[in-house]
A protein has these predicted regions:
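Extracellular attachment/recognition segments
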Residues: 1-87
């Protein structure tokens, strides 16, 4: 069996009503990064913490790109949970 080590980071996305792409720098040094996006309401107010589905790409070893189909409004925030894996 292989032991897997993990490192975590949490980043908040704040909508502005126009941007659909968000580059999130993690500096983990790898593309082996798990990404989960949670509904965080309006800076936590009214947050459901439900998983939100969006496209995620890993352009390089330092960041991930989250791409929403529709731009989040200025009153909608998301909490992005990032986990680095080392195999």
């Amino acid at each position: 069996s292989t032991q897997i080590e993990a490192t975590n980071k949490v980043i908040q996305i704040t909508g502005d009503g126009s941007d659909v792409d968000f580059d999130l720098t993690h500096d983990f040094g790898t593309k082996l990064v798990s990404v989960e996006i949670l509904d965080y309401g309006n800076d936590g107010s009214g947050a459901t913490y439900a998983t939100v589905h969006a496209d995620v790409t890993r352009p390089d070893d330092a960041y991930v790109r989250v791409i929403f189909a529709v731009a989040p409004s200025a009153t909608q925030d998301y909490m992005v949970l990032l986990k680095k894996f080392t195999v």
